[in-house]
Amino acid sequence: MKVEDYFHDILRERKIHLTLIDPEEQTPEEAVEIARAAIRGGTDGIMLGGSTTDSSELDNTARALRENIDVPIILFPGNTTGVSRYADAIFFMSLLNSTNPYWIIGAQALGAATVKKMGIEALPMGYLVVEPGGTVGWVGDTKPVPRNKPDIAAAYAMAAEFLGMRLFYLEAGSGAPEHVPEEMIALVKRCTDQILIVGGGIRSGEDAARVAGAGADVVVTGTVVENSDNVEDKIREIVEGMGSV
């Protein structure tokens, strides 16, 4: 089954949770243990990537995951090095509010042939960085959307939808002190029919409930997993929070 179809099947019943693993933060073996714990906690898939990912570390981690877990592995590339044949799909995304054309379409053009050759399912996605933006905001030369300007985010989302992007990601940044504002999530969801993904600053079941309740179809957590002593329990808390709305 294609990953996009998998998403739609789940969304007929409930929200989706994805766990983000950065290959540079642990060994492939440790990544497998994190993924297994997250799956036991209720996650629906593993996102793999980071803002500064090394291709060899990514490939080794993707292969280890492929051999040991059954949920989809979705690449979350920070550059052209963020591609591996061992993944099921890739968020083929444009960093919409970058000031550098490289991140809007240049890197995508450079990586497209590799994705095609490897036969990875490409999920067309608009990616928007919201204040504070974190590492991705700095690396990606962005003008982060102000937290009190939901209409700007909605305008980007509608433009992305009209350009054919079927997914839209609101990103507060890895380790952000707060998640994307609920008003912004709600307005974007009202304005488009895209699968709406929200990540950054989601640390608790309460955070996840607010984000999902505002309209997020997919909730992503990463830093909270890296910092947790009990990944299974933390993911379960977040997934249960999402299920409460």
Swiss-Prot record:
Q: Could you give a GO molecular-function term held by this entry?
A: phosphoglycerol geranylgeranyltransferase activity
Q: Which PANTHER family match?
A: HEPTAPRENYLGLYCERYL PHOSPHATE SYNTHASE, PTHR40029
Query: What EC class does the entry list?
Result: transferase
Which NCBIfam families does the record associate with it?
GGGP, GGGP-family, PRK04169.1-2
How does this protein assemble? Homotetramer. Homohexamer.
Record keywords: Cytoplasm, Lipid biosynthesis, Lipid metabolism, Magnesium, Metal-binding, Phospholipid biosynthesis, Phospholipid metabolism, Transferase
User: Its pathway?
Assistant: Membrane lipid metabolism; glycerophospholipid metabolism
Pfam families on file: PcrB
Query: In UniProt terms, what function does this protein have?
Result: Prenyltransferase that catalyzes the transfer of the geranylgeranyl moiety of geranylgeranyl diphosphate (GGPP) to the C3 hydroxyl of sn-glycerol-1-phosphate (G1P). This reaction is the first ether-bond-formation step in the biosynthesis of archaeal membrane lipids.
User: What cofactor(s) does the depicted protein rely on?
Assistant: Mg(2+)
Q: Does the keyword Metal-binding apply?
A: yes
> Record-annotated residues binding Mg(2+)?
22, 51
Please describe, based on the UniProt annotation, the reported consequence of changing residue 138 to A. Answer: Forms homodimers. Shows almost wild-type activity
Any GO BP annotation: glycerophospholipid biosynthetic process
Record InterPro entries: GGGP/HepGP_synthase_I, GGGP/HepGP_synthase_sf, GGGP_HepGP_synthase, GGGP_synth
Q: What family name appears in the similarity comment? A: Belongs to the GGGP/HepGP synthase family. Group II subfamily.
- Source organism: Methanothermobacter thermautotrophicus (strain ATCC 29096 / DSM 1053 / JCM 10044 / NBRC 100330 / Delta H) (Methanobacterium thermoautotrophicum)
Where found in the cell? Cytoplasm
Q: What is its EC number?
A: 2.5.1.41
Name-wise, this protein is Geranylgeranylglyceryl phosphate synthase
Annotated GO CC locations: cytoplasm
